[in-house]
Amino acid sequence: MSAKSRTHWIDRWEPEDPQFWESRGKRIARRNLIFSIFAENIGFSIWVLWTIVVINLANAGIEMSLSEQFWLTALPNLIGSFLRIPYTFAVPRFGGRLWTTISASLLMIPCLLLAVVVPSGWLAEQGHDTQFWVLLGCAATAGFGGGNFSSSMSNISFFYPESRKGLALGLNAAGGNLGVAITQLLVPLVVIIGVPTAAVKLPEHEVHLAYAGLMWMPFVVLAAFCAWRYMDSLTQAKSDKTAYVKALGNGQTWIVSLLYIGTFGSFIGYSFVLPLVIKNTFPEFLAGHPFIATYLAGLGFMGALIGSAARPLGGWLSDRLGGAPVTLWCFLGMGAFTALAILGVEDHSFPVFFGAFMAIFLLAGMGNGSTYRMIPSIFAELGRRDAGAGRIDPAAAEVAFKRRAAAAIGIAGAIGAFGGFLIQVVLRQASLGVTALVGAAETPAAKLAVARAHADWSVPALWIFFSAYFVLAGMTWFFYLRRDLAGERKPTPVRAT
């Protein structure tokens, strides 16, 4: 491969050839993986940026109700989920190098809007409704960061042989997911740079929201530059539209997508809302612990950190125990710990609530890995069944169903992200009652008293999530693990091992 080709397209790419892989393929793939992870990490960081912005709006002089704050975090989640669909097809259309450069460059838009528009004097002079719609438009652009996941995963999958794709995609996904924790850890510290320490300890203090946008701009430029300078495009990286149509028409794709709504949807949904939920559920605890309240955003970043680190663990356990059993136990555990979180809210115990949610993040992260591990196994079994029934040649079945599995992974990734939006919508609906009561209170002290008296506003939403996890556990058992009375596995489910 010539030096010139490093900045253009690679025509010959044979990762399944051991000699090619060891002599040049491994080095090229590793380089592309490194810069793909970097760009995806920045994408996730900006996708969840408004999770920290919303809890600091009041300190910036912009008052939004709790239900309005939920919209400001939910819309980036929704936009990012929609963008995952076209982003999946962008790599074959534009090439991995060019599209990674473009998608990274688009991240400059939400950064600029946050740095220039949100803290501007013009916005401060507007009426409440105008402020809300302007903020909603600015927040929506953060959704660009959510689409990066699908194109990044699609691009990297072409570079690695089948035997190494699992680890490569796991590292790519986990590296991107860590961007959530990075944002929720660093941005609260950055927005109070220059604010006196004594002032920061007060419930209301000065913040510099512009810094939340400015801090990412150099990294956006660096990600785009590195993608253009060091990444490659493969001429053979073509999308198989037939495989996508076949995958969309297969019921197994939709079943696994529902399961992924429960795992990844929980991870990203709780990542978006946990700082906001903590702030509005445990005001007394945060008032007594200003360091946690201000510097660490209520420790919300820890959930994203744990969930990101747990994803490879879920894949590793699935390799040994099977994807379906691991997924089943993850859902059962998430349901149990949701019940514990409800107990924490009702008893006004932040440690119980927080510990329960850290366990939920752990299990959701593991479930992300185990659910993705199920998809190739399911479609491989479907291919063997078709071949065994004489409907297709075994060799052709292996190739065709492997492509359908790849398509199903992309579809599940897009659909699963919508789960995060659903979680935020449910929590927003649960908050409407307390929002109305707070709005009716006449003085700031009365508003605070009402909010504290109704700090258990999230309990109805948590009961819905509790029920959903057990429904998803039942689906996992019914479709992939159930046996008949004689102890034989039912013929209709596919064992996802």
Predicted regions and their residues:
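C-terminal transmembrane helical hairpin of 12-TM major facilitator-type secondary transporters
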Residues: L321-T371
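Central cavity-lining transmembrane alpha-helices of secondary-active solute carriers
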Residues: W71-F89, F301-G314
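C-terminal membrane-cytosol helix-exit motif in multi-pass small-molecule transporters
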Residues: W216-A237, A473-Y480
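Extracytoplasmic gate region of multi-pass secondary transporters
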Residues: W50-I55, N250-S308, N368, Y372, ...
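Glycine-rich segments within core transmembrane alpha-helices of 12-TM secondary carriers
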Residues: G146, G166-I192, I409-I423
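Pair of pore-lining "gating" transmembrane helices in MFS-fold secondary transporters
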Residues: G25-V53, T253-G269, M358, L362
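Helix-loop-helix hairpin linking two adjacent transmembrane segments in secondary transporters
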Residues: N172-W228
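C-terminal ends and interior cores of transmembrane alpha-helices
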Residues: S105-H128, L332-H348
